[in-house]
Each structure stands twice: as C-alpha cells, then as structure tokens.
Amino acid sequence: MSGSRQAGSGSAGTSPGSSAASSVTSASSSLSSSPSPPSVAASAATLVSGGVAPAAGSGGLGGPGRPVLVAAAVSGSASAGGAVSAGQSRLSCAARPSAGVGGSSSSLGSSSRKRPLLVPLCNGLLNSYEDKSNDFVCPICFDMIEEAYMTKCGHSFCYKCIHQSLEDNNRCPKCNYVVDNIDHLYPNFLVNELILKQKQRFEEKRFKLDHSVSSTNGHRWQIFQDLLGTDQDNLDLANVNLMLELLVQKKKQLEAESHAAQLQILMEFLKVARRNKREQLEQIQKELSVLEEDIKRVEEMSGLYSPVSEDSTVPQFEAPSPSHSSIIDSTEYSQPPGFSGTSQTKKQPWYNSTLASRRKRLTAHFEDLEQCYFSTRMSRISDDSRTASQLDEFQECLSKFTRYNSVRPLATLSYASDLYNGSSIVSSIEFDRDCDYFAIAGVTKKIKVYEYGTVIQDAVDIHYPENEMTCNSKISCISWSSYHKNLLASSDYEGTVILWDGFTGQRSKVYQEHEKRCWSVDFNLMDPKLLASGSDDAKVKLWSTNLDNSVASIEAKANVCCVKFSPSSRYHLAFGCADHCVHYYDLRNTKQPIMVFKGHRKAVSYAKFVSGEEIVSASTDSQLKLWNVGKPYCLRSFKGHINEKNFVGLASNGDYIACGSENNSLYLYYKGLSKTLLTFKFDTVKSVLDKDRKEDDTNEFVSAVCWRALSDGESNVLIAANSQGTIKVLELV
C-alpha cells in the first residue's frame, strides 16, 4: 500500500491492507440501481463536493483511517455498485444491508457491524415524525442558503460554497455540468426573497415561543403544543400529566402576574393621590396664609384692637335708674364680642337689618364668593400695595353682590292692543338720552313712548303713551340717539331701518337695503350721525343720518342677530351671529375682525357692552358669557335662566346683567359671579281664550329688558316686558 490517502474502498474478499482505487461514476442525487458484473468489486462513495479530502490513514470501513463522511458501504460480489453524488441532500443515519450477500460480511470484522435503524423522532417524542423541507438547503454545506447564486445549469448554492467548490473543481456539484468560468454565477433573487420570508416566519414562531414561556420551559411547551394537535385516543397518562403540570404552572404564573399588576396599579394610585393631596395641602397653606394676612389687615382697618371711644359711638339716651342699669350692664357684658357684641347693640336698627340681609346673601352664595376671593387674591401675590388693591377689589365685589336683596315692582304697563290679541310680544325697550322717556316696540307694529316720571307717579296701572308710531311690519329693535334727544331708530321684519322723531312721530329717513329681516339697530354713542344694523342677509350695514344710502357693509357669512357699538370708541363694533360666535370689528378695517369670540353652542342672540373692555353675550344655549375684547377666551359663564329658542332680552348697567327667561321670569347676575343674584317672576295674565289653561302650561317668556342708566352711575331701576305685552318697571332694593 502506498502512502496516498483513500476514501475507504474495499471488497468482500480483499484484505484491509490491499489497495483499490475509488472512482465516482456519476453525480446523480440517488444511488444507481443498475446491476454490475459479478467480477466487479463493491465500491464505496467518496466525497467529491468542494474537493473534500478523506481522512488520513489506511484501512477499510472499520479502520481508523476511514473518511469523515461515508455515504454507504456495500459488500458482496453480487451487490449493486454506485456512487453518492455531492448533491445528496440527506445522509442516511444507518448503512443499508445489501441483498444477495453471503459469507462475505465476516471479512469486514467488527468494524462493519450494521447500526440499528433509528426510529424517527420529532422534538424528542417517540413515534413522531416531522417532514422538514429541504427546498432552501445548500447541497454543499447542508445549511440554509446564504446569498443564493446559481450556475448556468440552474442549481442554486451559497455563494461562498459554490465559489470555493469551483475553485477546486470546475463542475457543478449537483449535476457535474462543466462551468468554464468562475464568474459565470448569477444571483438568484427569487430564492433570496423566499429564504427571507422563511426566516421571518421562523423568527415569529420563535418569538412567540420565547415570550409565552421561559427559556427553561420552552421545550416542554413545544411538547404541549404538539400534544394538542394529537388525536385524543393516542394520549396516554404521562402526556395528560405533563399537560396538567404545564397548565397548573401557567395558572400560577398568570395569577402571580395579575397580582403584581394589581399591586402596581394600587401603588400608582396611592402615589398620585399622595401627590395630589400634597399639592392641595400646599395650596391650602398658601390660602390660609393669605387669609391670615387679610384678617390682620381688616382688623387694623376696623380698629378692633383699639378701645371704642364714647365719641365714636351713637349718642346714648339718658341713663336709666341704677337698678335698671345694673341689669343692662350685666346683660351687655355677658354677650360675646363681634357682630353680635356690645358695640353692635348701639348701632341703628337699619344697620342691623342691612347686616342681617347681607349675611343671608353671603351664606347663600358663599362658595361663589370664596372662589372669587381666591381668584382675585391668588392671581399674583407681590408687594403690600398690590395686596391692598386686590383686597379692595374683592371688597367692592362683595359689597355690590350683597347690596340688593330683592326686586320690587314700581309700575305696570300693557303693550297689548286688545284683550283677544294672541300675540303682543315686546321685542325692545330703550331709554332716551336723559332717561326721561322710554320707548316700547314689538310685534304689534307700534312704537309707544312713555314719560318715566309720569308712569312712576301714577297710582293706577293704566298708562297712556306720550306718543305712538306705527310701522308697516313687526318691529324687532329700537335705539335712541345719544346726542339728539328726539331721534329714534327702528328695524323691522321687512329689513327696513327707519329714523323717527320720537316726540312728533314723523319719519325722517327710511333705509331699505337689507334683503331679509333686520334684527337689530344701534346708534354710535361717540358719533351721533352713525348707526348700524344687522340682518338675516348676513350683512352689517353702517348708515349716516345725513345720507340716504349705507356708507359701509360688513359681510358676516351668517345671519346677524344683534349689533352694538362700543360705549368708549367710535370705531369698534360687536355683533352676534347664527354661527355661535361674537365678532368684534374695527370700522377702519372691515375686511377681517379684530377678535372672534367662540364658546357658545348655539346662535348668539344678543351682544352688549358691559364696559369699554368687556362684552356680555346671550345665546339660545341658556348661557350668558363674559368676554374681554383683548382675550379670545371666555372670562365667565352665567347659568340659571332658560333660553332655547326665543329672543329674551339682555341689558347691563356696568355691574349687573339682566336677561329674560322662557319660564316667564327675569334673571339678574352680578358680573363677578356665575350664579343668579335675583329673580322676578311675571304673573301670567290669561286672556278670555286661555282662561282654562293651567299656569304651568303657558309658553310665556320675558322678551325684553332695559336698565335706566343715570349719568351719576346709580342704576337700580330697570324695565322688563314679556311675550304677553306686560311691562314692569322694577327696582332693586
């Protein structure tokens, strides 16, 4: 035997030391089954893929020099011969016994002993089988193909494997096709895409398995999943016990995770609650500090720590007899100090009654007042001067809120033309420049002018107007000029704006440019010649008393329900629309508004100026909203009245806001608080046709309201009217 390496050839009658050259007859993927002549010795396949050399050493199959990978060993003179190609996808795990071999196996000795055929296994389970796809296995390295390249013959391999194989042998390892040039390799993009998808599916399965159980139990859970797909008749007791064990383990795991999650949520809740309470505690401590500071300041201002001198008290009557004085003295000293102490017993009765009524209102609206106080005082705490001004601001708010206790009627008028008239809605009430006369207009197409002093002085409720004017259509709004005492403007349902002489009843101007119903008209307080009107044609028109046509027009894009000039500027105008917004314009630039106030949920029926910087708006969403002309958000919302479909009137005297309600009542608000201050219920006056109707069944509503604003600023008188035509002159007391 020479020193050259052999792939492990041998025959049945040849000793292990004899030399026989091995050859490869074909590169097919299966063993050839064609018979060979009897004289031909059995041949053993050697590895040809990639030029892999056999293991070093000499000897046959059983010797120490056998090759690393042996495809098959066949012995016997009549056995089938063949070779195993390098493209074989799987190697048999046991040598197959050849048929027709007799008496030759003894020559191989113990080294050629046959291995038993192993039972197919799948994940360690007996009697199971898994069909693994070899579509993407490289015929050279028997692993998943990496960077698939193919030869001209169409076979695909890993690029590294086929490149190394062709460097040693220029033939295809699969079909033995001659590859002339190593560069004649082409990427197989389709196979690469399929392999990528296969890897993604495998990763998804592994991800689910890794996250469903721990790494130690992953194999057992894989067994459990396989058992679930097994027929129940094939399950034995061991399998059932395994499944129960895994389920109990999973149950305990889920219970532990659920309990941990509950504890985590509880911990988060407790921490958030603790943080909120700490913040509340800090806020309360700040508020207490402010309260203590203000209490000391008020005590110093009221002089409670200084003794009350005799000169500072109300002069007393002559002292009674000693017997009586002793009783009085003992009574006085037994009373606690404060509002009900001795110093208060010396006050006038009106003081005590006023204080009692204010206390009553303070108790009824304590929460609102408390909120108002802290919003005023906690807004910005700085120096002593700022603190004093904030306290004075709240003191003024508290004083105005508790000033009035009730609403008292002074006089009653009627706008109805006759007893059988079913509709006598008063749509507008306005005072003239000096508040000496007031005009009433409505759906009866009449404007009635009354003298305020005469109405108040008459002992009876039958009052006749000083003048009466008749229009061609229902009247929606009227407005007095702030400069000309007799000049009155009206708007009606035909879209006409008319200028009247309020005392003679003569028409001076008629404007007919609106295409639809005109809802509102208003004179400019700073420019006596300028007035504005708003209509359902989505236009606000500006008029001059000297001209016959409009001087400007603003496109509102929605029905205009109300229009009002600023009381402190000749250029600024506000109007409410059916688009739920209040639009604020500068007349020097009518192309776009200065501000659009959004917040109402329905159409804005009224917009009135509380001051030069504040606007109050009413809507059919049953809310009033207070706005600042320089801020887009709502300052305060007023709720309590009912307004869902009608024009119920809106007016303000600077501090108090009055509006009607669809429950036939008048509501009053203070601009600093959101809740209702006072209410006044109109009596239901039944006509002859409605005498059998119950009071709760009526659909009457307060339709108009107006304050009597005097030049000195005192304004506690207002006039309100309802849909029955009843007009009430009311006073706040």
UniProtKB/Swiss-Prot annotation:
Sections of the chain in a coiled coil: 231-306
Class in the EC hierarchy, top level: transferase
GO biological process: positive regulation of proteasomal ubiquitin-dependent protein catabolic process; proteasome-mediated ubiquitin-dependent protein catabolic process; protein ubiquitination; response to ionizing radiation
PROSITE patterns: WD_REPEATS_1, WD_REPEATS_2, WD_REPEATS_REGION, ZF_RING_1, ZF_RING_2
Site (Interaction with TRIB1): 474, 493
Residues covered by region (Interaction with TRIB1): 645-647
Functional pathway: Protein modification; protein ubiquitination
Motif window: Nuclear localization signal 1: 111-115
Sequence motif Nuclear localization signal 2, location on chain: 197-208
A Gene Ontology term for the protein's cellular component: Cul4A-RING E3 ubiquitin ligase complex
Stretch list, region Disordered: 1-43, 307-327
Predominant place of localization: nucleus
Example GO molecular function: zinc ion binding
Domain of life: Eukaryota
Keywords tagged on the record: Coiled coil, Cytoplasm, Metal-binding, Nucleus, Repeat, Transferase, Ubl conjugation pathway, WD repeat, Zinc, Zinc-finger
UniProt domain comment: The RING finger domain, in addition to its role in ubiquitination, functions as a structural scaffold to bring two clusters of positive-charged residues within spatial proximity to mimic a bipartite nuclear localization signal (NLS).
Family: Belongs to the COP1 family.
Biological role: E3 ubiquitin-protein ligase that mediates ubiquitination and subsequent proteasomal degradation of target proteins. E3 ubiquitin ligases accept ubiquitin from an E2 ubiquitin-conjugating enzyme in the form of a thioester and then directly transfers the ubiquitin to targeted substrates. Involved in JUN ubiquitination and degradation. Directly involved in p53 (TP53) ubiquitination and degradation, thereby abolishing p53-dependent transcription and apoptosis. Ubiquitinates p53 independently of MDM2 or RCHY1.
Designated name of the protein: E3 ubiquitin-protein ligase COP1
Organism annotation: Mus musculus
Gene that this polypeptide is encoded by: Cop1
